[in-house]
A protein has these predicted regions:
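Short, exposed "boundary/linker" segments that immediately precede the start
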Residues: 1-3
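Selective transmembrane helix interface/packing segments
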Residues: 6-224
Length: 224
């Protein structure tokens, strides 16, 4: 919501972590060889992430599948947390999606960027890693460095922009209630539709985030 300060972001981010950990822990208890119920859902999500990133990571898919599974579930949950309730005062927003805050999305982007560069050095060695910046020829060095910076920024801004704008529109729809008693049913109906659409957008953005993350990591660890 424009102009409204978020005062509970650390708590909501921690809540997202607790929800993800709790659901995964609960779903993975008493696992059987033939999955069923909650285990089946958990394995389906893991296989979905695994198949999504395999094209970018190739033979290294298994090395990063668990990491990107955790990131996918965290981002998806964080994207949709703000859809559950609306708790705010004139100056503070007490309940919002953590990923509607740029600080959260840039932190996630920095984590992926740091991992990709560390893994690139580990897999190719420092000389092999630096050689990538001189490809296809040394004059491309400034452009290759700029590309890394734009990748970092775009990964954060894409997620932040989509989730933040969704919450702004949700707030505007809910304000229809204050206009007139006759606007309340319209506001309620529009809000239901928009919440459903926002949940879908939250999934798409989590999906795009792990695709781009796997691309950035794969670009560093795969052979040229």
């Amino acid at each position: 919501m424009t102009g409204v300060q978020t005062c509970a972001l650390p708590i909501l981010s921690l809540l997202t972590v607790i929800i993800v950990f709790g659901v995964v822990f609960w779903s993975s208890r008493k696992m059987t060889i033939k999955p069923k119920g909650k285990q089946n859902v958990l394995e389906f999500i893991y296989e979905f992430v695994n198949s999504t990133i395999s094209q970018s990571l190739g033979k290294f898919t298994k090395n990063y599948s668990l990491l990107l599974f955790v990131i996918f579930t965290f981002v998806f949950t964080a994207n949709n947390l703000g859809l559950l309730v609306s708790v705010k005062s004139e100056h503070y927003n007490f309940w919002t999606s953590p990923t509607s805050n740029f600080g959260v999305t840039i932190t996630l982007s920095l984590i992926i960027t740091l991992i990709s560069h560390i893994e690139g050095i580990r897999k190719k060695g420092f000389k092999g890693y630096l050689k990538g910046y001189l490809s296809p020829y040394p004059a491309m060095l400034p452009m290759n460095i700029l590309e890394q910076l734009t990748n970092l920024a775009s990964l954060a801004l894409r997620l932040f922009g989509n989730i933040y704008s969704g919450e702004v529109l949700t707030g505007l729809i809910l304000k229809l209630v204050t206009w007139s008693v006759f606007a309340a049913p319209v506001s309620f109906a529009l809000n239901l539709v928009w919440v459903a659409f926002s949940a879908f957008i939250g999934f798409i953005q989590a999906y795009v985030f792990i695709i781009l993350s796997s691309n950035y990591i794969g670009d560093k660890v795969n052979e040229e």
